[in-house]
């Protein structure tokens, strides 16, 4: 799996934006990706040093449209912690 296939998009929420001050970045990743693949993908794409990777699976939510019910897609989130001497990731480039 290529590095661009592993990392899908950054997660932009209030808590993930607050965690960026501690050099913790949250990304949606491919559901088949493991911690090692996420680490190498982040280091290759952004050119930073990764200290730690935490991964969690998010179940799909039940959504209803009238009498029809279905689920949203399940997804996988990775919280990547950078080393202290690493540069910051510019998600929103000015």
Curated annotation (Swiss-Prot):
Pfam families: Ribosomal_L23. GO terms for molecular function: rRNA binding; structural constituent of ribosome. PROSITE patterns: RIBOSOMAL_L23 (PS00050). InterPro entries: Nucleotide-bd_a/b_plait_sf, Ribosomal_uL23-like, Ribosomal_uL23/eL15/eS24_sf, Ribosomal_uL23_CS. One of its GO terms (cellular component) is ribosome. Gene3D superfamilies: 3.30.70.330. Keywords: Ribonucleoprotein, Ribosomal protein, RNA-binding, rRNA-binding. The keyword Coiled coil does not apply. One of its GO terms (biological process) is translation. Belongs to the universal ribosomal protein uL23 family. One of the early assembly proteins it binds 23S rRNA. One of the proteins that surrounds the polypeptide exit tunnel on the outside of the ribosome. Forms the main docking site for trigger factor binding to the ribosome. Part of the 50S ribosomal subunit. Contacts protein L29, and trigger factor when it is bound to the ribosome. This is Large ribosomal subunit protein uL23.
């Amino acid at each position: 799996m290529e590095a661009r296939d592993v990392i899908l998009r950054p997660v932009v929420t209030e808590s993930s934006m607050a965690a960026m001050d501690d050099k913790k970045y949250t990304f949606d990743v491919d559901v088949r990706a493991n911690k090692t693949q996420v680490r190498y993908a982040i280091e290759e794409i952004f050119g930073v040093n990764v200290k730690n990777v935490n991964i969690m699976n998010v179940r799909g939510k039940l959504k209803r449209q009238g009498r029809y019910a279905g689920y949203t897609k399940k997804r996988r989130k990775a919280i990547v912690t950078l080393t202290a001497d690493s540069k910051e990731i510019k998600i929103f480039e000015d």
